[in-house]
């Protein structure tokens, strides 16, 4: 029997977030979902590209993340694809995030969604928006790393 305590299956990854934001700190959050949303997530029909998280009334909400409607069920019991979903974190983590977002002007961005021990989890990050020259600089740095690796491989 396999050890499921540390295993997790990544459903979707928001690669654009790492390009647009400088990631300072990451958190693991649970997410409040309906049954058809969980079935769609298990099928891999999720998009976090336009998603972000907001603080409202001491709670954290995931906004604009697209979970496609589940095809096997009828339209009557299906969910709204872009509805606002509550993220579940410990109270002290929420207090820490409130302080950093309000005082330092940081943004909460979803990085990836995955299954951990049968539960759907979202990895959210505190991010600082990159300027255009920062994006170019990171691309240049990545290209230089590739060139150095190629040179090392040849010699």
UniProtKB/Swiss-Prot annotation:
Family to which this protein belongs: Belongs to the SmpB family.
HAMAP family on file: SmpB
Chain residue ranges for the region called Disordered: 136-155
Protein name, as recorded: SsrA-binding protein
Coiled-coil ranges from the UniProt annotation: none
Any GO MF annotation of the entry: RNA binding
BP GO annotations: trans-translation
Function: Required for rescue of stalled ribosomes mediated by trans-translation. Binds to transfer-messenger RNA (tmRNA), required for stable association of tmRNA with ribosomes. tmRNA and SmpB together mimic tRNA shape, replacing the anticodon stem-loop with SmpB. tmRNA is encoded by the ssrA gene; the 2 termini fold to resemble tRNA(Ala) and it encodes a 'tag peptide', a short internal open reading frame. During trans-translation Ala-aminoacylated tmRNA acts like a tRNA, entering the A-site of stalled ribosomes, displacing the stalled mRNA.
The keyword Transferase is assigned to this record: no
Gene for this chain: smpB
UniProt keyword list: Cytoplasm, RNA-binding
Cellular component per GO, a single term: cytosol
Subcellular location(s) of the protein: Cytoplasm
NCBIfam families found in the cross-reference section: PRK05422.1, smpB
